[in-house]
Amino acid sequence: MKAVGMVVEYNPFHNGHRYHLQQAKKISEADVTVAVMSGNFTQRGEPTIVDKWSRARAAVMNGVDLVIELPLFYAVQPAHRFAGGALSLLNALGVDSIVFGSEHPEWDFARLVKAEEAFNQESFNKYNATYATQFNQQLKEQTGVTLIDPNDILAFAYTKAKINQGYHFELLPIKRQGSNYHDQQIKGKIASASAIRQAISEKGDYRQAVPQVMGDILATIKSIPLWTELYPLLRNQLIQAPVSTLQSTYLMAEGLEYRMKEAAQRSLDFNSFMKFTKTKRYTYAHLLRVCLYTILQITQEEVEKHSKHPYLHVLAFNKQGREYLHEVKKELALPLITKVDQEMRDQLLNLDYRAGKLYQLFTPVEQDLKHPPIIIN
């Protein structure tokens, strides 16, 4: 069977995602679609609007054949690690192509990757600018191009991962449809995920922008999971933990632990905390990721250890997806997981399990232990 892969968050699954899926099937001429999807926390480190099982269900009911979870140690990362991890799973699953959205699909991303080789990496040490800002300054000098739009940044990261790892699948960019990624208003049937989340938080009308299945799921949520609700746990951890413990937290560097600890002591709410912590050196997304790893007490050592042992955690599939798994199962180089037992909880999937337990503050649904895949016939 010919397979096409997609890297997704589906936060939530909307009509733009359905268009992406339809185009992926069309231009790849694939028999089966495989989506590698972030779990309960996004690349930016934010809790998803509904849990991973609900999003996987909506995806399969709208035509995705197989949904695999992107482990936390790949999912909550800067673009290059997020993309590299996702592509490694799709490569392990034997996909023939990967289709992704881009604001500028006509760009030669391989040329941009090649241009990066000439960068002066030693100059990326300015503390008054983020890495992304310094990267774009050099990229513009070399090529005249700047990577600003989120999907273009990921397109660059996918291309770089493919080149560096020597993957043989084909990368097929398509033009992103509808609203801008950051648009906060719903203006038609295709809207950005952030606009849909905004409409839900304001009790506005979003149903025209999502398929019925996703709309029905969203109608059941009482409130949107937000960092404002997690902040008391984060604040307690930052105040109580010694600096030496905070220093070992994944992504914590350059004395950020001192700044976050002081911010927690001064700030009673999350917005004030972030305002105090934010500097020109770090993006908001980077700080959110550090906050998540802090609250989960995940260390640099743990991420390094677990990322050496990736796996394929099946969230949902249909008949076509089941047939594809049966076809590739014997050739898989990574463990295929369909139900998490206690040994997996304590070892292989421990980071995802901890993230799932944190997410259960927003939902009564068990997120990992003994949860079987969703099967849509």
Swiss-Prot record:
It catalyses: cytidine(34) in elongator tRNA(Met) + acetate + ATP = N(4)-acetylcytidine(34) in elongator tRNA(Met) + AMP + diphosphate. Its EC number is 6.3.4.-. It holds the Pfam family HIGH_NTase1. The keyword Magnesium does not apply. It comes from the Bacteria. Belongs to the TmcAL family. This is tRNA(Met) cytidine acetate ligase.
